């Protein structure tokens, strides 16, 4: 491990304390302004369809846009992770500005706006082939050691939570 990551002071979850960036040497090497893009074609699976209510609108769903914002931000982050590091989503915000229909091409762009300690904040946009802005928002990801992520969200953590951990 490189020592770039914050320790996990909470001992019980994946939260990272608020406040100023940690000591020198823990900032992710991602330059503000760096971008990653994701090209999407709207399919029926990406339209508004609720489990209990069924199909609602035949347009690109806000929740699909949120997923693509997170994916574009992760695509940016992955290029900068070191061996033994992993990322996990902390927050996503979406403002859906206009519709796009099945068959439409959408470009999702994540742009690094801030790096603070082991947190990456991206401004995200979704635009159609004509350059019309369909949505905007932000994502925040936290970088942690793989072992910590595995201990908190892997199969053993799930078994502990359900009370089925064979270790007792």
Predicted segments with their positions:
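A generic structural signal for short beta-strands and their flanking turns/coil linkers
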Residues: 34-38, 88-92, 104-108, 118-120, ...
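HotDog/MaoC-like acyl-thioester-processing domains
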Residues: 101-102, 111-168
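Hydrophobic (often cysteine-bearing) scaffold residues that line and stabilize catalytic clefts
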Residues: 65
């Amino acid at each position: 491990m490189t020592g770039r990551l914050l320790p996990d002071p909470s001992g019980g979850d994946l939260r990272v304390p608020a406040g100023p960036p940690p000591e020198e040497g823990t900032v992710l090497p991602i330059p503000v302004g760096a971008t990653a893009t994701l090209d999407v074609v709207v399919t029926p699976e990406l339209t508004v369809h609720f489990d209990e209510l069924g199909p609602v609108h035949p347009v690109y769903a806000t929740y699909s846009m949120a997923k693509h914002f997170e994916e574009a931000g992760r695509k940016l982050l992955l290029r900068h992770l070191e061996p033994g590091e992993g990322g996990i989503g902390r927050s996503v915000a979406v403002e859906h500005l206009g519709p796009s229909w099945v068959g439409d091409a959408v470009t999702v762009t994540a742009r690094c706006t801030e790096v603070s300690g082991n947190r990456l904040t991206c401004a995200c946009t979704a635009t159609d082939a004509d350059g019309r802005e369909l949505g905007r928002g932000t994502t925040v990801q936290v970088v942690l050691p793989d072992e910590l992520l595995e201990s908190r969200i892997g199969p053993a953590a799930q078994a502990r939570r359900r009370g089925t951990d064979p270790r007792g």
